């Protein structure tokens, strides 16, 4: 395809692309510049590989007496035969503990709001999200959501205590993935 960029549009710092198809292998996108009098560079001035990506946050369970690590991986789709792979070329996606929202169930759950707190270790593409141990008598569960969209939802627990302030967002919608397949 061909896209046209004129001088009035040249100040936009970021382009957003929506891939609505299933995960695909890397696609090379090239750029060829031609000015208004049609004198330009023959061929492409450069190309970049665009990949289908996602964040994978693993489930975990364990004792309320121990910290609970959850693997968090930045991945890209390589092929149908090789599936999702660690994206070692991603050195700039930043995930913070404040990007996670917590939801604590009521009935039958001994884990109250923010009796555990989230910390993040590691660096892209291999992070570890750790829930601090809530202590004896605080067995229970929490649903944890990593906010990747432009807007955040929920409350964070970055320190043990009462429910924390509103969660932030990593603002990386290109890493969202349809886990339910619907």
Feature locations, PLM:
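Core sequence-specific DNA-binding domains of diverse transcription factors
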Residues: 1-182
């Amino acid at each position: 395809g061909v896209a046209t960029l004129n001088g009035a549009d040249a100040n936009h710092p970021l382009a957003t692309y929506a891939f609505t198809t299933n995960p695909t292998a890397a696609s090379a996108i090239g750029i060829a510049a031609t000015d208004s009098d049609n004198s330009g560079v023959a061929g492409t001035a450069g190309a970049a590989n665009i990949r289908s990506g996602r964040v994978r946050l693993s489930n975990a369970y364990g004792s309320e007496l121990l910290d609970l690590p959850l693997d968090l991986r930045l991945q890209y789709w390589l092929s149908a035969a090789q599936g999702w792979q660690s994206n070692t070329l991603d050195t700039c996606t930043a995930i913070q503990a404040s990007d996670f929202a917590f939801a604590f169930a009521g009935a039958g759950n001994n884990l109250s709001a923010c009796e555990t707190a989230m910390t993040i270790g590691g660096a892209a593409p291999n992070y570890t999200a750790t829930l601090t141990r809530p202590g004896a008598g605080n067995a229970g569960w929490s649903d944890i959501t990593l906010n990747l969209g432009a807007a955040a939802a929920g409350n964070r627990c970055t320190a043990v205590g009462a429910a924390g302030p509103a969660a932030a967002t990593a603002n990386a919608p290109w890493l969202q993935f349809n886990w339910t397949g619907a």
